[in-house]
Amino acid sequence: MELIRVLANLLILQLSYAQKSSELVFGGDECNINEHRSLVVLFNSNGFLCGGTLINQDWVVTAAHCDSNNFQLLFGVHSKKILNEDEQTRDPKEKFFCPNRKKDDEVDKDIMLIKLDSSVSNSEHIAPLSLPSSPPSVGSVCRIMGWGKTIPTKEIYPDVPHCANINILDHAVCRTAYSWRQVANTTLCAGILQGGRDTCHFDSGGPLICNGIFQGIVSWGGHPCGQPGEPGVYTKVFDYLDWIKSIIAGNKDATCPP
């Protein structure tokens, strides 16, 4: 019954959330059912909130701006309408944010580390994603995925996650595209310069995967998504490795890069 309630909640996508900076995969195709085993759904009583990434059996990484009251995490889901037998639901036991994060900028140091209330079991549709040992290079082909909008200007959301390939771009591209705001050095600029493929509403918090490695967290981008010359901005996981490892090791006073 619990999973039935979960799926019912996921189908109730409140339009009020569509104005947030959360994003969805536009220009992609249905993901292979086994290629997103680390992809996590964050949801509450209002419905779908964000994506996230399982990094081990007890910890999930998502975007800080995805934080909400009383959310849960769902693992192993592919279709919102058809259950996988190995789907698992967990509550957050603890949530960790960068202590030096700017409170008036929801995408500053846009990373949240979640400790689960109990361990998740690996299964056919559930497995953690490896953290990086180095950042991706410009030109790398990376994978985005999520249940976000498939048409940027309409409230149309898929029943299954969509995936697409995009490229790591020079950081100067995003600085030029978004000259009206600061684009932090601790982010990755990624997309297709001519447009047409991008993360979009409700993809926020999900992974940017390069060569099978967890390299980025969906943070923010242009509106509508997928426009030429307006790539996505992703939190660079590599820059937060020390913070992530310190928190997991029990050092709750760990600080993030400036």
UniProtKB/Swiss-Prot annotation:
Q: Which InterPro entries match?
A: Peptidase_S1_PA, Peptidase_S1_PA_chymotrypsin, Peptidase_S1A, Trypsin_dom, TRYPSIN_HIS
Q: What are the record keywords, sorted?
A: Disulfide bond, Fibrinolytic toxin, Glycoprotein, Hemostasis impairing toxin, Hydrolase, Plasminogen activation, Protease, Secreted, Serine protease, Signal, Toxin, Zymogen
User: Is the keyword Ion transport in the record?
Assistant: no
Q: Which residues belong to the signal peptide in this entry?
A: 1-18
- Tell me the protein family, please: Belongs to the peptidase S1 family. Snake venom subfamily.
Glycosylated residues are 185
PANTHER family (alphabetical): KALLIKREIN-1 (PTHR24271:SF47), KALLIKREIN-RELATED (PTHR24271)
- In its UniProt entry, what is this protein called? Venom plasminogen activator TSV-PA
